[in-house]
Regions:
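N-terminal targeting or signal-anchor segments and their processing/structural boundaries
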Residues: 1-372
């Protein structure tokens, strides 16, 4: 499978239904492809695939031979994109989600100690900042779980120049700051120092003092702003030119952050009593909002009670992953290993949270589909 076109094949209609007629009595392997091209050959990099674990013994007409397609993880590691950005950082996109990645500058080796590396949340993209850009070329090694994966070379021209514009995003909820969270500023490049003299807080047009700005211990691109904010008050923080000094002596241009501290009464609590039909199995329960963004994730094996506090009023939903291999995340399927993607149960009940209200619910996770 995957090396040549199948000798027997058909296509589905718009609803996914298919038929194969006039087959002789025999034993068959059945696969499904959702192709990007039309070559009828499985291309792991681009196509989705489905399969039946067991062969079909065709000795009479068969109905309801159903397959679900999925996207496999790449079996062979590859860097699918790389570039030297206009700010001098190195960017790489990978075709695999790494588990325990380690990145090193091997040439010039002197650049390795001061490098800064930031992976995205799924470990399939990374950016590297170097504190010296006088090199002609640089080699980067990528390892995962102690295994060498690849070495990538970046080259630059001697006359190349770079522009660094410091930009700060935030965690505001529209015009409001969640009273249960500090104000967080996340920058597009590493910040090396903060000048607290280059800022002021305006509340009713009166400059204020007492603010602290510290680097987040888990994310070097993020700074936490703390101040004794008062609920329902409007604030504006003004940062002057050069308040933040970034890597390679870059400076920010003046910017403001305006918001009102929301009231705690606008948030609620959801308590879930979770009952499992199969003891000893591991589950991952995710709470998602209307946009299907995961706002919380919990892992457990037996009946439990989960409490989600200080949630913004709105509609929420629950989905549960049957975590077969107990690694704390959803895993796709694998044709070679004859493994299906991990099943997901979507709770039909909408779990709305109202302002200043505690909601108690019970959900029962059914047996995993396909188990006896």
């Amino acid at each position: 499978f995957g090396k040549k076109k199948a000798s027997i094949y058909t296509t589905t209609d718009s609803s996914g239904n298919y038929q194969l007629k006039n087959l002789r009595k025999d034993t068959y392997r059945v696969y499904a492809l959702k192709e990007q091209s039309s070559d009828k050959i499985y291309q792991q990099a681009t196509d989705e695939v489905g399969f039946l674990k067991d062969s079909v013994v065709l000795d009479q007409n068969k109905t309801n031979v159903n397959l679900e397609v999925f996207k496999e993880d790449a079996s062979i590691f590859r860097v699918v994109d790389r570039k030297l950005n206009s700010d001098g950082s190195l960017l790489m996109s990978l075709n695999q989600k790494l588990r325990k990645p380690v990145v090193a500058i091997i040439e010039p080796a002197a650049l390795d100690a001061a490098k800064l590396v930031k992976f995205n949340s799924t470990n399939d993209s990374l950016r590297i900042w170097l504190k010296d850009l006088t090199f002609d070329s640089v080699k980067v090694s990528i390892n995962d779980e102690g295994k060498a994966l690849d070495t990538i070379k970046f080259s630059r021209g001697k006359k190349d120049t770079y522009t660094r514009n410091i930009v700060a995003s935030d965690n505001l909820e529209g015009e409001f700051l969640n009273p249960n969270k500090p104000l967080r500023l996340t920058f597009n490049l590493p910040i090396e120092s903060v000048d607290l003299g280059g800022r002021r807080i305006i509340k009713k047009k009166i400059p204020r003092t007492g603010i602290t700005i510290t680097r987040d211990s888990l994310d070097f691109l993020t700074y936490v702003v703390r101040y004794p904010w008062v609920a329902k008050r409007k604030y504006e923080i003004s940062f002057a030119d050069g308040a933040f000094t970034g890597i390679l002596a870059s400076k920010n241009k003046a910017f403001n952050k305006s918001f009102t501290l929301n009231s705690r009464d606008n948030y609620g609590t959801l308590s879930l009593k979770v009952q499992t039909a199969e003891k000893g199995k591991q589950y991952i329960l995710q709470v998602v909002n209307e946009n299907e963004h995961i706002v919380s994730s919990s892992t457990f094996q037996n009946d439990t009670t989960l409490k989600f506090t200080n949630y913004k009023a709105g509609k929420y939903f629950v989905r549960v992953i049957y975590d077969h291999n107990k690694n704390g995340k959803w895993d796709t399927g694998n044709i070679k290993l004859r493994v299906y993607p991990e099943k997901v149960y979507n709770e039909a009940k909408e779990l709305s949270i109202k302002a200043n209200w505690d909601r108690n619910e019970t959900i029962t996770i059914p047996k995993e589909p396909g188990t006896i």
